[in-house]
């Protein structure tokens, strides 16, 4: 899965300057993992968040146009799964994610609920001049304002989703 591609890419990026041989091995592992992931063709929300992040890291390392193209394609496919309309007859919350494009199920994680937000924040920071940068910022704001804060306000303890504290 793309999660492993992300991990290998993060290792490569972290090791790049101080341990170039190990970084190169991690980079090769990330590329092999990415090839495997793309071959499987999985396009779920879970997979898209990891593929987008992995491809962005690979772009930061390599500067390759094809890495950037895959990163932006993946993050924008991820955004297509964000619920931007109110559903179920309510007008209180939105900004969360579907499990896949066109799915009725929600993307839910007990730990890692905010991973899509982390990914979007990486894109905003890495590509400040990109044409989609404002779209990424708007998706973050929608999740924060109309999902995370709504549920924190309704919780008697003022609790936020787990990963919100990590951002």
Label each region the model flagged.
Residues 1-167:
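Glycan-recognition and catalytic cores of secretory/periplasmic carbohydrate-active enzymes
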């Amino acid at each position: 899965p793309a999660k492993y591609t992300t991990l290998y890419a993060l290792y490569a990026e972290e090791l790049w300057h101080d341990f170039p041989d190990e970084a190169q091995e991690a980079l090769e592992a990330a590329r092999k993992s990415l090839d495997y992931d793309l071959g499987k063709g999985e396009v779920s929300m879970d997979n898209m968040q990891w593929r987008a992040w992995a491809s962005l890291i690979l772009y930061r390392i390599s500067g390759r146009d094809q890495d950037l193209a895959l990163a932006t394609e993946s993050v924008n496919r991820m955004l297509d799964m964000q619920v931007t309309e109110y559903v179920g007859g309510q007008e209180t919350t939105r900004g969360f994610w579907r499990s896949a494009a066109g799915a009725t199920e929600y993307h839910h994680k007990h730990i890692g609920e905010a991973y899509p937000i982390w990914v979007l924040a990486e894109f905003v920071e890495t590509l400040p001049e990109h044409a989609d940068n404002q779209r990424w910022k708007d998706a973050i704001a929608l999740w924060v304002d109309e999902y995370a804060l709504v549920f924190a306000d309704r919780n008697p303890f003022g609790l936020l989703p787990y990963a919100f504290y990590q951002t």
